[in-house]
């Protein structure tokens, strides 16, 4: 009625951190690193540096050949949610106008735990998605959508060599001292303008499709989460 296009949510996702458990365990045992250290963004940066240095030490005759530990699928989620965790909205909308909140100290924290470790080789983004980088052995862990879990590899392939791997699933990290806020994202459907009969039929379908039983079947097949709270319990 107001000329706007609305999307009706049919599937949801959030973010998680997934780890190549098979290659994580030798590193963790050798360095005393724990999974709990990955609970914060700063902790991941510290662990990634430690992993880079540990892998570099494995070849003392070859300097500066440490390996990246981590990557992220969505830079925008990192900045938007990271700022929110630290108590600020990076995009503030009022009366239809958007203001960019560039708090220098907070942006610096985000920069130091994203761009800096990428430049130093502690993080890496080489393939289209970070699950691709896990498969090629270029990283050990990544933060990405829950819907990407189905693509997490069961083997690592490096050249002509391949070996099976297991995995660990953790919460996505929180900025140190920040609020535990996670991203909410997902897919939706729209009903386009046509005639009353088709519009009504489409609305009935969407209502049926998002009911608990139907929606659960759909999201289990598509690796998403249901849109109704009752279906998540």
Residue ranges, per PLM feature:
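A structural signal for short loop-to-beta-strand junctions that line the ligand-binding cleft
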Residues: 1-24, 168-182
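Extracytoplasmic/periplasmic solute-binding protein
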Residues: 2-17, 42-99, 139
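Short, solvent-exposed loop/beta-turn-alpha elements that line the ligand-binding surface or hinge
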Residues: 33-37, 62-64, 69, 88-109, ...
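Short helix-initiation/N-cap motifs at beta->coil->alpha
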Residues: 39-43, 123-136
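Glycine-centered hinge/linker elements that transmit conformational signals in sensory
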Residues: 45-52, 93-127, 172
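Extracytoplasmic/periplasmic substrate-recognition and gating elements
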Residues: 108, 120, 158-232
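Paired acidic/hydrophobic, glycine-rich loop segments that form the ligand-binding mouth/hinge
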Residues: 140-145
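A ligand-binding cleft/hinge motif common to bilobed small-molecule-binding domains
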Residues: 146-163
């Amino acid at each position: 009625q107001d000329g706007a296009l609305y999307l009706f949510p049919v599937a949801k996702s959030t973010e998680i951190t997934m780890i190549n458990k098979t290659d994580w365990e030798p590193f963790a045992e050798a360095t005393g690193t724990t999974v709990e250290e990955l609970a914060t963004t700063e902790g991941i940066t510290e662990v990634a540096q430690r992993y880079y240095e540990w892998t570099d030490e494995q070849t003392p005759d070859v300097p500066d050949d440490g390996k990246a530990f981590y990557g992220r699928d969505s830079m925008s989620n990192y900045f938007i949610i990271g700022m929110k965790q630290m108590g600020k909205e990076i995009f503030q909308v009022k009366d239809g106008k958007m203001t960019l909140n560039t708090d220098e100290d907070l942006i610096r924290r985000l920069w130091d735990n994203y761009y800096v470790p990428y430049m130093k080789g502690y993080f890496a983004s080489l393939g289209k998605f970070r699950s691709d980088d896990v498969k090629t052995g270029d990283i050990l862990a990544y933060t990405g959508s829950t819907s990407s879990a189905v693509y997490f590899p069961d083997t690592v392939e490096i050249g002509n060599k391949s070996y099976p791997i297991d995995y660990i699933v953790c919460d996505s990290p929180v900025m140190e001292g920040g609020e535990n806020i996670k991203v909410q994202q997902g897919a939706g459907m729209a009903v386009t303008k046509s005639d009353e009969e088709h519009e009504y039929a489409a609305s009935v379908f969407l209502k049926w499709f998002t009911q608990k039983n139907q929606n659960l079947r759909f999201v289990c097949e598509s690796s998403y989460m249901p849109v109704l709270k009752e279906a998540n319990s």
